[in-house]
From Swiss-Prot:
This is UPF0354 protein BCE33L4443. NCBIfam families: PRK13668.1. Belongs to the UPF0354 family.
Length: 270
């Protein structure tokens, strides 16, 4: 049979068919481009050159080119992933649990209002890790969690502060996409706990802010409630309008504490 560029294109597409790769054929230049769907990085194959090799080596020529393209694309993908970081992100418990039907995200419970997801961050963009991506990365869920928490501890933090009616409010807003993630840095929380004299209240109304407050009176609780609601309404990626009292590594939603206070007050009146 006579081999043409179009037939060679079909042969290579059969050999290199993978769900994560795309093909683009330029019939004028007789070039087939194979590229990664996510990154758009790829390889251009000049088909007349492959046809010339096929005239001499037949099937072996196709095998060699397919092998070269496959190895090059896999190497690009590994290089891309090695440059990427895995970081945790905080989301509301109402956030979707699946990327698509049958492909759940990797998640960890956090509080009654929040859940931890995991992002593969390549500086320009990030993608939440689901089971299919986990398999491509060749990692276990435990490895992802450990890597993410380690990287979360390396995130810098510098708070702005404001004092109202004796209550001090600390704001973190770097806009790096991971401000709320700092709530997972246990050493940061412990260091703040040491400098706080009243109740330590923490809020993550949306992904680009972390609020830590030193609450010493009821006015402080009213202020943090209003503040959290305002930030929640304005956030690009809202998380929760509730704030939490932090004590001994636990987060207790404020509305639960308020209910408990009301019950106690009721008993005392009776």
């Amino acid at each position: 049979m006579k081999m043409t560029s179009k037939k060679m294109k079909d042969e290579l597409m059969k050999k290199l068919s993978r769900p994560e790769w795309d093909f683009h054929y330029d019939s004028e230049k007789e070039v087939l481009r194979i590229e990664q769907k996510d990154s758009k990085k790829g390889i251009n194959v000049s088909l007349p050159g492959v046809v010339a090799k096929w005239e001499v080596n037949k099937e072996k020529a196709i095998e060699e080119v397919a092998y070269y393209v496959q190895e090059a694309l896999i190497a690009m993908h590994k290089e891309e992933n090695s440059a990427a970081k895995i970081l945790p992100v905080i989301r509301s418990t109402s956030f979707p649990k699946q990327a698509e039907e049958g492909n759940p995200f990797i998640m960890t419970d956090h509080t009654a209002e929040t859940r931890i997801y995991y992002a593969l961050d390549s500086n320009k963009t990030y993608r939440l890790i689901d089971e299919r991506l986990l398999q491509k990365l060749g990692l276990t869920e435990q490895q992802v969690r450990e890597m993410a928490l380690f990287n979360a501890r390396s995130l810098s933090y510098e708070f702005k502060q404001d004092t109202v009616a004796g209550n001090t409010f600390y704001f973190l807003n770097t806009n790096d996409g991971y401000d709320a993630t700092r709530i997972l840095n246990e050493s940061l929380l412990q260091s703040m706990r040491e400098k706080i004299s009243g109740d330590m209240v923490v809020a993550v109304p949306h992904q680009d802010v972390l609020i830590i407050a030193d609450i010493v009176n009821e006015i402080g609780y009213d202020i943090i409630a209003q503040m959290t609601m305002k930030f929640f309404a304005e956030g690009h990626v809202p998380i929760t309008s509730l704030s939490f009292v932090y004590e001994d590594g636990d987060f207790e939603p404020i509305f639960i504490l308020a209910k408990n206070r009301k019950k106690t007050d009721g008993k005392e009146k009776g």
